[in-house]
A protein has these predicted regions:
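A contiguous strand-loop segment
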Residues: 1-102, 122-244
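Acidic, low-complexity N-terminal propeptides/linkers enriched in Ser/Thr/Asp/Gly that mediate export
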Residues: 4-11, 16, 275, 373-430
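Second-shell loop/turn segments in exported
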Residues: 105-112
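Short, charged, surface-exposed loops that flank catalytic or proteolytic processing sites
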Residues: 112-120
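Residue-level signal for secondary-structure boundary elements
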Residues: 118, 131-135, 260, 371, ...
Length: 430
């Protein structure tokens, strides 16, 4: 489960377009940030998580946040200033078992697109040529279609799909998407047979106003996933005034709808003992100025984490990770604190305000005044030390969470160690 938003420059504090996303997945699935430089192809095909795809002659440089076992990413940006976030949506069309994962579609679109509109066309072509689907879960089976929020410096688009059928809408001002369809009859473009297909299945009556969401969505999953509640809350927050980088962090940390562990109604999601449960495993804010400015947690639950700045160009990034596993190790160093904190919320929030909030504000003030490589390295190194410090202070604190949530997290902690011993290899077929 995930939530994404975009605010065009006309509605932001400094005139730059801002994108934000929380990636909500299984709590034991590490997610980390990766940089891939611009490449010139050698004619070989591309091997994604699930499929072999024809490669193009040249790809853009990209920075993506990706689950450990995937080729693609949950959210990312390229060196042309195109940013994309995807969401799982649950529709009436059958999900293919051999399609492209939405995260792989996202990465390919970033590698190939020059603008937001170009990315929309690229995604549509990929869905038509290769299909979408496959198992998107880590230790569980999870099949779904995808929606995408796509932006560049000037424009943004919402693209929603159901198998090969799709509709898209150009964003005016701001937009948010969640794990539900949002477009009714107000889309700007769509699959030529999107209405006829709904009529053929009996999902839409000819002669009545067509709504993509009403016709194609599985309403029960929308309700139990809390998607509608999260979407409405994010829309409310976006309408409260001009959005800044700091305000974007606050939006992704929001807990207005529920204080309970395991609730699917919060933008900042904490896993717990409930029938359906996910956790925010990484968060990203992208500011689209002359050069993309990325603020990433590379750790779970943003309300207990620190957003850190990263910059990149076509061939280099300021990301202080030398090896792919460095990002996973950083995620793990914070996870020790996160798992103590979730069960000791009051004391954890005190520590976060004391150690993290001021540090994050200092980073915001320093951004642009220090060499990018130095600031990113300092941000990741110091935040890792902060996590260790808070862990040591929290270990002796009394647990506040109830019996069932304590049992839930005991199971998750044991499972995390098992997965770590296997280098977080996926347990079930994709």
């Amino acid at each position: 489960m995930c939530d994404s938003f975009v605010v065009l420059g006309s509605s932001t504090a400094d005139g730059r377009t801002i994108f934000g996303k929380n990636s909500d997945r299984e709590p034991n699935e590490p997610q980390s940030i990766h940089f891939f430089p611009r490449l010139t192809g050698n004619g070989t095909d591309l091997f994604t998580t699930t499929q072999r795809v024809s490669q193009v002659s040249e790809t853009n440089a990209i920075l993506i946040s990706k689950p450990s076992w995937m080729w693609g990413g949950e959210m990312g940006v390229n060196d042309k200033g195109v940013v994309i976030g995807n969401e799982a949506v649950f529709t009436k069309e059958t999900v293919r078992r051999d399609g492209l994962l939405g995260m792989d579609i996202l990465r390919i679109a970033l590698e190939r697109s020059e603008s937001a509109e170009h990315a929309v066309k690229t995604i549509v072509e990929l869905i038509e040529d290769y299909g979408q689907g496959a198992n998107g879960g880590f230790t569980k089976y999870l099949y779904y279609h995808n929606s995408f929020l796509i932006a560049d410096r000037e424009n943004a688009w919402v693209l929603e799909t159901s198998d090969s059928y799709w509709v898209s809408k150009k964003v005016k001002g701001s937009a948010a998407i969640s794990n539900c369809l949002t477009l009714g009859d107000d889309f700007d473009d769509g699959h030529p047979q999107v209405i006829r297909n709904a009529e053929n299945h009996g999902w839409h009556k000819p002669g009545k106003a067509f709504s993509f969401a009403e016709s194609y969505e599985k309403k029960l999953i929308r309700k139990f996933s809390g998607a509608g509640t999260r979407l409405r809350r994010m829309q409310e927050l976006l309408e409260e005034g001009e959005v800044s980088i700091e305000r974007s962090f606050e939006i992704l940390r929001d807990h207005e709808n529920s204080k309970h562990l395991g609730s699917m109604r919060n933008i900042c999601m904490h896993a717990g003992a409930s029938l359906v449960s996910s956790q925010t495993t990484s968060s990203m804010v992208v500011v689209l100025g002359e050069k993309p400015e990325i603020w990433i947690t590379n750790s779970s639950v943003p309300c207990l984490s620190v957003f850190k700045p990263v910059w990149f160009d076509s061939y280099e990034s300021s990301l202080p990770f030398d090896e792919p596993e460095d990002g996973i190790n950083y995620w793990g160093s914070w996870e020790k604190f996160i798992r103590l904190a979730i069960l000791r919320d009051s004391k954890a929030k005190e520590l976060w305000r004391e150690y993290c909030l001021q540090f994050e504000q200092d980073l915001l003030l320093t951004a642009g005044k220090m060499k990018a490589d130095d600031l990113s390295e300092q941000a990741f190194d110091k935040s890792r030390n902060i996590a260790r410090k808070m862990t040591s202070l929290l270990e002796e604190e009394e647990v506040e969470a109830g019996f069932f949530n304590r049992k839930y997290w005991n199971r998750q902690n044991k499972k995390l160690q098992e997965l770590k011993s296997r280098n977080f290899k996926k347990e079930i077929p994709t």
